[in-house]
């Protein structure tokens, strides 16, 4: 059984969505370092995706060091990789730009965007922070 949720969004790459869901699950602590990651076959069957897509997902996560292949054990979750300080900004730029464009499109202000980011951050960390803004 796949230990993470996947909400397929029409028009977006299934590969990208599965990779994102797996990484989100690792960062949220739902999948912990050392735990066995589902096999390619299990991913394909449970998520109803093509086995080639499932294979690409696992290989990508190994290449990006989110997973490790361990002979005799299978694929296991690795410690989440840390980006160097100089790389973090570059890695975030495209996604931040997309967020800002979408916020502007719907008329959200900077405070709303910051609060949404803080809420999501805290939800993923299992924290509940009460805000005075809402």
What feature does the model see in each segment?
Residues 1-36, 42, 90-94, 100-128, ...:
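Extreme N-terminal segment that seeds HTH/winged-HTH DNA-binding domains in transcriptional regulators
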Residues 11-12, 29-30, 45-47, 68-73:
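Short hydrophobic/aromatic-rich motifs at helix boundaries and adjacent loops
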Residues 36-68:
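N-terminal helix-turn-helix
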Residues 37, 66-81:
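Short, Lys/Arg-rich nucleic-acid/phosphate-binding segment
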Residues 47, 81-82, 123-125:
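Short secondary-structure transition/capping segments
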Residues 78-97:
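A surface-exposed regulatory interaction patch that couples sensing to output
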């Amino acid at each position: 059984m796949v230990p993470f949720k996947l909400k397929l969004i029409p028009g977006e790459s299934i590969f990208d969505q599965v990779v994102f869901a797996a990484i989100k699950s690792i960062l949220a602590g739902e999948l912990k370092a050392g735990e066995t990651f589902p096999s390619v076959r299990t991913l394909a069957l449970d998520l109803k995706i093509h086995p080639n897509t499932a294979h690409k997902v696992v290989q990508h996560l190994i290449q990006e060091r989110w997973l490790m292949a361990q002979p005799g054990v299978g694929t296991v979750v690795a410690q989440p990789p840390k980006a160097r300080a100089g790389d973090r900004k570059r890695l975030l730029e495209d996604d931040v730009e997309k967020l800002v464009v979408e916020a502007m499109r719907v008329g959200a202000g900077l405070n709303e965007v910051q609060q949404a980011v803080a809420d999501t951050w805290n939800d993923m960390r299992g924290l509940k922070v009460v805000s005075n803004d809402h």
